[in-house]
Amino acid sequence: MKIEGFENTDEPFCTVNRVEIDGIKIAEVYWHAVEFSELDFVLIFFGYNKENQKSITGLIEEYHLKKANCIIGCIDIACEAIDYKDNEYEAFSSLMKQFDFHLDSASSGDFENLVEFCTSTKTGCPTIILSDFKSESGTEIHFVTEESSSINELKSLISESCKKLFSHREQKFPKVMIAFLTNGYELSLDEIQELFDSLDDFITDDSCMMVLNNKISGQNKEVIKVSLIFCEEG
């Protein structure tokens, strides 16, 4: 079954088309200019199993034909567990290499926050551009989102989430993309620097790129939301 529908963003030049096909959720992020319309991001959220691998491969090929600039796979954390000692892992790994980025063990909330991150690179004030998402095919990413009305609490939440996620990791990340998302609240440079400093244990020097977007409709005007994409070495 295919379900489709558009949603508007805060800016007329960016739209998100939602598609659902047999339980596979897809978000298509379009960039519109005066003379052209481009499919910049395609995010595919699915529960991996041996039966649907062919369907996912077909979708990726279809979006390549549509000239999608960046295809991101989000694997549902609630899906069937993968046996790493089995040939299934080889098939899974082969599928992941077909995406530009893939986020393993993703929740539906992670998927929605990642869609918001991608649209913010089009509607906010970014230093992140589309080419920053382009690395070696199959690059694994890790995703963290936290929000609070207090900078100190936000720093603590981000630090704790990162410590938990990267508890068995010693190497720092070479590239991190950060979105600061608010609804009318404009972060000061000092506040941004404080939030960057909370990441010192996890990122290399000068590895950060960021986007500021203070037009997140529906968000509490006092709340600051921070989403981070940590990229493995490509």
Q: Model-derived features: where do they sit?
A:
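Tubulin/FtsZ superfamily GTPase core signature
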Residues: 1-234
